[in-house]
Curated annotation (Swiss-Prot):
Native species: Penicillium roqueforti (strain FM164)
Keyword Lyase recorded: yes
Annotated region described as Prenyltransferase, given as residue ranges: 333-742
Name of the gene: PrDS
Protein name: Conidiogenone synthase
GO molecular function: metal ion binding; prenyltransferase activity; terpene synthase activity
Residue sites binding isopentenyl diphosphate per the record: K414, R417, H446, R463
UniProt binding sites for Mg(2+) 3: D453, D457
Amino acid sequence: MGETIADVYAESIDPEIYANNPAYSSLFTPYIHKQTIIADHVSVQCHIDLNGIDAVGSKFGNLNAHAGNFTSLCAPNCLPERLALVAYTVEYAFLHDDETDNAADQEALLLENKMLHQAINQSSMTSVSNRVSAKAQRKSEVQAKIAAEYLRLDPVFGEFFLKAWQTFTASVQDVRSLEFPSLDDYLEFRIVDAAADWTLYNFRWGSGITLTPEEEKIADPMSYVAYAELCLVNDLFSWDKEYDAHVKSNGEVPLVNAVHIVAVTQGLTHCAAKAVVQAEIRAHEERFCYLKEQYKATASPSDSILSWLKLLEHSMAGNWVWSLCVPRYFKVERNPYKDHLEKFGSEAVRVLTPEEHLRDSKQEINGTKEIELQEPKSNNTAESDVLAKYTSGYPTIDEPVLNPYTYINSLPSKNVRQTMIAALNSWYKVPVKSLLIIEGAVNFLHNSSLLLDDIQDGSVLRRGRPVAHQIFGVGQTINTATYLMNEALYLVQMLSPSAVLVYTDEMRNLQLGQGRDLHWSYHTHVPTPAQYISMVDGKTGGLFRLISRLMRSEATVNRDLDISQFATLLGRHFQIRDDYQNLQSDDYTKNKGFCDDLDEGKLSFPIILSMQSPGFSNTALSSVFKGSQKGETLSPEMKQYILEEITARGAFSQTKAVLRKLHIELLRLLMETEQKAGGIENWALRLLIMKLDLGDEKKKEAHKSDSAWKVNQRRAWKGSQKNGRPIDKACFLRAMEEASQK
């Protein structure tokens, strides 16, 4: 497989493009994807999405009229169904790199990467008011589109890839202030700074290549050599452009380039330093070939590793031939982006769009049929009730000073509600003043509910920290919570009378929903799934509907766009997922304690389903929950017993099936709402839905730390033989020089 992979989707490019060019001296033959038009389309689409159609071609990334698309050249065997996303992501990375490279001060650089990190992670977000400009809104949508699509196509890789992306953004803001005593020290960091590892992980996934942890470790030295070669080639061809930017900015734009490092550390002119970098490139390619042949000579070389090595060869050759005459580095007569847009039009390039089949609720998000759930019966309505239309009608009961608020507001947060506000503003275009009022009111209400929840549930931890009432006392915490409710109302009154009606309506829903939950837990009354979902619609869905209804009441466009059903289903998904994770997630154990819902005597969704399973006695479980109401903390052994009972009754599996059904319906409703909103795609909401999906819960692959590349560097250059003894890299370079002179 490793030797034939080039024949799947790749074809060789015309040798006339590079063979007679003295600047091309790679040992490898370049290929290009047969469907490179897909990569070209989405490269232009990224420009339109990010800056509008008039700005297409104002900056340069993938497209190269001379040799071809960067992604198509470096990943010529990318699976066609993944090529669009891979190329779109690389295009955005190019444009983001331009933003950071041109940042004339550290503060601007930090801001660019902070915004990217927040958009991907949807956490620690700054105020919504910082993201209401057209440019910021477009950028946020593009970032969310990328993240959501990876999570949709492959949740396990998507989570890993997004974490690797965050590592990349963090490294950029760190490395630019460092000095490097040698080229090897520089390359260790440059691999991450230039996103070489991140980009190749993307190409590997796109090409359908998977390595086990053991295979990854075997391939690491060869991967390092290839990554370093890619960085060196990039630095060599981009040197003139980067040096010009450095000079024009009077040194404010830093030089992060191998040519500069060699010149400084070895006391050479820039011309001589470029020659050294060229020699280093050849040395790394030679070393790659040597290590590859060594591996192929082992007893049973892995096809996966050989395929990965072939991809690395393609990437090295593709990067080189692309760099020969690319608009990013050199002036060209014609703009390939403008030419492509003129030839194909703006509609043709819109390749990366939401999946059309989601309009049919009977289909799964990934193209397979939806999980067939049992038709609801009179004694088991969980799966039908979960998609039922929301009906209001709760009676009123709302009672709403500042240290507990300051404390809980400082704790880490998933920022789901703030994310939702920013996302909905794509549709409603709420004035900034109103947007800030809504954001403040929702923040007050959310934190108020958390303070009261922790008291009412008897919680010990909140997000891994002590709960507020253990620090400030129960009385003060209650006083703060009620004060926050009043402050939220005070803010809402600044909007309009209709906004106040929305507030009071949803506060009724929220408080009665919470009251039902407390009543059931205290009296150990097991509700039906339908009753539970009705409670969730008030307790959790109320705040989501409050956001959507307040924003709709203040909207400047799409005032007839009602997303109450979407907000209600989002609340159901959020709460049922929280119930599941509390009993099954290691992260929840770390942040809240081991199955703390059991200590609280909370009758969560999996427990309700388990206690309604036919053929099982509930006597033991009921006794356990009655005991917890007397303040008895359950032992780990007792909790394990309960978990085993829930598992045996199939309640966890049924809960996951319900969550999956909600996930699919939320995505379908989102597409339906996007059409009603004039075709405005809301990728921030789509990303929020994807991040809430439990996925297949496969074991997540750990990302390498920066220091790991130093280890791989040593492994890559260890063991080369000359005259029967090991030699270091310097000797290896000298040996090459001697060989070239013979």
